[in-house]
Design a protein with these regions (language model features):
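A glycine/serine/threonine-rich, flexible loop-to-helix segment
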Residues: 141-142, 193-203
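C-terminal substrate-binding subdomain of Rossmann-fold SDR/epimerase-dehydratase oxidoreductases
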Residues: 204-332
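Residue-level signature of the cytosolic catalytic core of signaling kinases
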Residues: 43, 151, 189-193, 251, ...
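Proline-centered turn/helix-capping motifs that create local helix->coil transitions or kinks
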Residues: 127, 134-139, 191, 205, ...
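A short, amphipathic alpha-helix embedded in the catalytic core of nucleotide-handling enzymes
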Residues: 21, 170, 199-204, 231-235
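Hydrophobic alpha-helix immediately C-terminal to the catalytic Tyr-X-X-X-Lys motif of short-chain
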Residues: 162, 166-170, 200, 258, ...
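N-terminal Rossmann-like NAD(P)+-binding domain of SDR-like oxidoreductases, especially those catalyzing
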Residues: 1-186, 226, 302, 310, ...
């Protein structure tokens, strides 16, 4: 039983991670500022689901910003956390091109505030949500953690790589156990509306036009969110100094095949337009997961069709609870 701080706790991956920690008996303090491109009610709904968890008495939410060093220090001093799970970030490769300064402020400076608190108050484990985007346009795949990651394609990827390197320094200087988890194309219930899987469902159901890059021939390692959350929880217990670990399914699926799976489940056709892939987008993502299997006991067992079915069922259910008589807000 551990005391864990989870940043970004009200978000997509964060809320599933909180549930997984509560399921195993941990005490969780969630930190979230509810400031994202998505509608705030989506995060509020995630929190409402967390408060209905059978062990919700072990969950506390603090509404604050990771860049607020004073609040972060006070939280860590009050709760004496065994671990920090840092999931809060500005996400998205294309938006980072338009707002690169803000991405570095939130993603890098916010991480430094947390690393300083971990150093000052003796937090033993720091788990950081990195991304497969750090691999850039590498033509060697599946991607292994030993590959060079020195040519990111976007400010978002560069900001995540910067925090990985900061983690290496803090682990070396302050004996911090730091695990950077490189997530691969996460999807599932509570998907954000700016993510591809959600956009495709919006297109199938509401006819909203969605670009299909490179005729759908891009490959993605679609990884179900609950498998990711289990990997994050396992990393909390990793006491091996500095580690970088891929969390994917280990299987690259053509985007057009993923579209077809959603269309079959939803009984409709997506409104797609062919466009060349943006320069910031990776042509392929595919994880080698042997290291995660060895160090974390990681075993992603949700195949793409089962995960897509769970996403579709959640999508149908959450439409009824959306504001404005089921309007789901803009797709960004």
């Amino acid at each position: 039983m551990k005391s864990v701080l989870v940043t970004g706790a009200a978000g997509f991956i964060g809320s599933h991670t909180v549930e997984a920690l509560l399921d195993r008996g941990d005490f969780v303090v969630g930190l979230d500022n509810f400031e994202r491109c998505e509608d705030p009610w989506r995060k509020r709904r995630n929190v409402a689901e967390l408060r209905s968890h059978p062990h919700a008495e072990r969950f506390t939410l603090c509404e604050a910003d990771v860049r607020d060093g004073e609040t972060v220090q006070e939280l860590c001093q009050r709760h004496r956390f065994d671990a920090i799970v840092h999931l809060a970030a500005l996400a998205g490769v294309r938006a980072s091109i338009r707002h690169s300064r803000r991405y570095f402020d939130v993603n890098v400076n916010g991480s430094v505030c947390l690393l300083e608190a971990a150093k000052d108050l003796g937090v033993s484990s720091f788990v950081f949500a990195s991304t497969s985007s750090v691999y850039g346009d590498s033509e060697v795949w599946p991607f292994a953690e030993t590959q060079a990651c020195d040519r990111p394609l976007s400010p978002y990827a560069a900001s995540k790589r910067a925090v990985e390197l900061l983690g290496a320094a803090y682990a070396h200087l302050h004996q911090l156990n730091f695990v950077a988890l490189r997530f691969f194309t996460v999807y599932g219930p509570r998907n954000r509306p700016d993510m591809m899987a959600y956009k495709l469902l919006e297109s199938i159901v509401h006819g909203r036009r969605v670009p299909l890059y490179d005729r759908g021939n891009l490959r993605r390692d679609w990884t179900y969110v609950k498998d990711i959350a289990r990997g994050v929880v396992a990393a909390v217990d990793c006491q091996l100094g500095y580690q970088v670990i891929n969390l994917g399914r280990g299987d690259a699926v053509l985007l057009k095949d993923f579209v077809s799976t959603l269309e079959q489940l939803a009984g409709g056709r997506a409104n797609l337009c062919d466009e060349p892939a943006p320069a910031a987008d990776m042509p392929h993502t595919h994880a080698r997961i042997e290291k995660a299997q060895r160090l974390l006991g990681y075993a992603p067992h949700t195949d793409v069709r089962d995960g897509a079915r769970a996403l579709w069922h959640w999508y149908l259910t959450q439409q009824a609870s959306a504001p404005e008589h089921g309007a789901l807000g803009s797709v960004l």
